Swiss-Prot record:
Disulphide bridges: C4-C25, C10-C30, C14-C32, C20-C35
Tissue: Expressed by the venom gland.
Organism: Pandinus imperator (Emperor scorpion)
Ranges in a coiled coil: none
This protein's name: Potassium channel toxin alpha-KTx 6.1
């Protein structure tokens, strides 16, 4: 899991770790979508 301050913090980690193209920052944790 990746901590974040905003959705912009999540895009690269989501792509690198999961291959998911979409992401959001929810409760200071990245959520990855579109896997």
């Amino acid at each position: 899991l990746v901590k974040c301050r905003g959705t912009s913090d999540c895009g690269r980690p989501c792509q690198q770790q999961t291959g998911c193209p979409n992401s959001k920052c929810i409760n200071r944790m990245c959520k990855c979508y579109g896997c």
